[in-house]
A protein has these predicted regions:
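Short, solvent-exposed loop/turn segments at secondary-structure junctions
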Residues: 101-104, 179-182, 208-209, 268-271, ...
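C-terminal transmembrane module of eukaryotic multi-pass membrane proteins
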Residues: 253, 257, 265-267, 273-275, ...
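A short, acidic, amphipathic alpha-helical segment used as a generic capping/interface helix at domain edges
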Residues: 233-257
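Domain-level recognition of soluble alpha/beta enzyme cores
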Residues: 117, 137, 279-302
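Generic beta-sheet signal
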Residues: 93-95, 172, 255-266
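Active-site-proximal alpha-helix that buttresses catalytic centers in soluble enzyme cores
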Residues: 2-7, 18-22, 26-199, 203, ...
């Protein structure tokens, strides 16, 4: 299920407006993709995350120039994606994948420790001081982390000493998990970079965090407590990406047909599932991280 939402960008002098979500779909089955795709990460990669010599754990959430390797320009990435799509043999897209900034649940886990969080506190809605379920908000640090990504976008796009080829291409479509923390992160990440009109976000249920017993991953107090295995999460993400990569059919608005650059705002569990699905180097992204990838999609029946 999905719903469209527009987040207009305010004048630069204004503080970010309070988050006011529009219509949001409830939990339920998403439309099946017209074609199931198999996904791989383009190798060799343009980005430092796939470099074996890179200590990804030591990287900041926002890597300068979003982790583009030295000696490579964004124009090189765009040109290669365009060339590969023209040659055929698959559908290629540059995908900026972002983890939401710190949420109240992340703060609570840090407060109590992972073991106590998983065993006890994650199954509650709060502790009398913090409220993290269902659907927790960003903390002030989480808001700042999203704004740090926004600052990097502005720095790269408006550097007077940069050539057009050195500037990162903006996503042509924005996708988000239905959770408030992901939506608010995307809003703050891209605020103002598209000009005064802003950019529409498309909410996809399939980008939500791992379904389990944690109250922070429930859509509402009535959300069913079901447990999703690692394999089921990967399968769910594959189906969602297949909808995004499929040609427009008129029946599924998730298609990014014609867009060679897209962005996804989601969660740590979803990003790790994406790494498993595509063969990307596996790591745990920090809150507020933005990781670019070039993905190739081919019909699953041909692999």
């Amino acid at each position: 299920m999905q719903a469209a939402m527009t987040a207009p960008a305010p004048a630069p002098a204004q503080a970010p407006a309070a988050f006011a979500p529009g219509p949001s779909p409830g939990p339920g089955p998403a439309p099946a993709p017209a074609q199931l795709y198999a996904f791989t990460t383009l190798q060799p990669s343009f980005f430092i995350y796939d470099n074996p010599s890179t200590d990804v754990a030591a990287l900041p959430a926002v890597v300068p120039n979003f982790g583009l390797k030295e000696g490579v320009e964004w124009g090189d990435v765009v040109q290669e994606v365009r060339r590969l799509n023209e040659v055929g043999g698959g559908v290629y897209k540059l995908v900026y994948v972002g983890r939401h900034g710190q949420g109240v649940h992340n703060l609570a886990e840090a407060k109590y420790g992972t073991e106590a969080w998983d065993d006890d506190w994650s199954h509650r809605n709060g502790d009398g001081e913090l409220v993290w379920g269902p659907d927790p908000l960003l903390t002030s640090l989480g808001e700042q982390q999203a704004e740090d990504v926004n600052e990097e976008w502005r720095l790269r796009l408006h550097n007077p000493n940069s050539t057009p080829s050195q500037k990162p291409p903006l996503p042509q479509r924005l996708y988000s998990s239905p959770f408030t923390r992901a939506l608010e992160t995307a809003k703050r990440t891209y605020m103002g970079v598209y000009g005064s009109e802003g950019k529409e976000q498309l909410i996809l249920e399939g980008l939500r965090e791992t379904i389990g017993g944690h109250t922070c991953d429930m859509r509402s107090p009535k959300s069913p407590i079901a447990r999703e295995s690692e394999e089921e999460l990967v399968e769910r993400l594959q189906e969602t990406l297949s909808r995004i990569f499929s040609p427009a059919t008129g029946t599924d608005v998730a298609s990014s047909d014609g867009a060679q650059v897209i962005a996804i705002s989601c969660h740590s569990g979803v990003m790790q599932a994406l790494f498993r699905l595509t063969g990307h180097r596996f790591f745990t992204p920090k809150t507020g991280a933005l990781v670019p990838m070039v993905l190739k999609a081919v019909p699953a029946t041909s692999t």
